[in-house]
């Protein structure tokens, strides 16, 4: 399918945490119309002054081939009304933690329109939940639902004086990402739609590049087609990195403000 119809359509981003807010700013800086949604529970905190300040992308932004996008841009809409966010959008990006997926999809599914493409990142089995709920809720809209194994950046939202700001400190941008759709027959169209997401800029910029490791192995940059959605979820390194780090660092967490005399607010797994 020719996915070029997505070129001039708005992008809706569901979830205004670190990944969602950064992707919103990134896409807006590239000139896209972006609608950013967050649940009423978090919107008051995550949208403080966003209409006045816009979203700023800062940080080192390390990327192997040097791609960066810096500056401040305003989104077209920041709202806790999902219907307003997704109406007429071509691409819907779900950038939320796994425990929020079911609630988000239960709200989203009745609002879906034919031709929309849903990108879930990181997927954390969200594609399975979405398709399962679509069947249960009797949704017959012709949409594409696909998974990415991770987010396109390593980022932190800057906090000042306990206030969540609209500055996104991007430390690095990845140059390769694995993706797949559910069902797999939609994967080619899903991968093609990714070129209309400016937040994947470093990946698009690196498309076709090949680097050689010290062991002589070839590493291909750009978008990589996964075998299945299950493959995508098993490709996520976070469980391998974060679980051992949390378990082995439990004593440090417990004693950060006592034995170590540090401020608990400054604790980081890293």
Task: State each model region's role.
Residues 15, 38, 96, 122, ...:
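Short beta-strand/turn micro-motifs composed of small residues
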């Amino acid at each position: 399918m020719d996915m070029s119809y997505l070129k001039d359509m708005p992008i809706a981003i569901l979830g205004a945490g670190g990944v969602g807010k950064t992707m919103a700013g990134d896409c807006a800086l590239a000139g896209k119309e972006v609608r950013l949604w967050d649940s009423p529970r978090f919107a008051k905190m995550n949208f403080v002054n966003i209409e006045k300040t816009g979203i700023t992308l800062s940080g080192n932004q390390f990327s192997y081939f040097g791609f960066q996008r810096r500056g401040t841009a305003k989104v077209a809409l920041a709202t806790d009304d999902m219907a307003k966010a997704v109406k007429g959008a071509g691409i819907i990006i779900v950038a939320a933690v796994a425990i929020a997926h079911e609630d988000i999809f239960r709200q989203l599914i009745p609002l879906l329109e034919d031709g929309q493409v849903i990108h879930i990142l990181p997927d954390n089995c969200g594609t399975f939940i979405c398709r399962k709920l679509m069947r249960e809720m009797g949704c017959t809209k012709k949409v594409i639902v696909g998974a990415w194994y991770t987010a396109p950046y390593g980022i932190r939202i800057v906090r000042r004086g306990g206030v969540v700001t609209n500055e996104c400190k991007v430390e690095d941008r990845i140059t390769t990402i694995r993706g797949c759709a559910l069902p797999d027959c939609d994967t080619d169209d899903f991968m093609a739609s990714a070129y209309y997401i400016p937040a994947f800029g470093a990946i698009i910029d690196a498309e076709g590049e090949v680097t050689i490791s010290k062991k002589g192995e070839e590493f291909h940059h750009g978008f990589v087609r996964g075998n299945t959605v299950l493959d995508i979820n098993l490709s996520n390194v976070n469980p391998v990195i974060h679980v051992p780090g949390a378990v082995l660092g439990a004593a440090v967490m417990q004693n950060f403000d006592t034995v170590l005399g540090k401020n608990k607010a400054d604790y980081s797994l890293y």
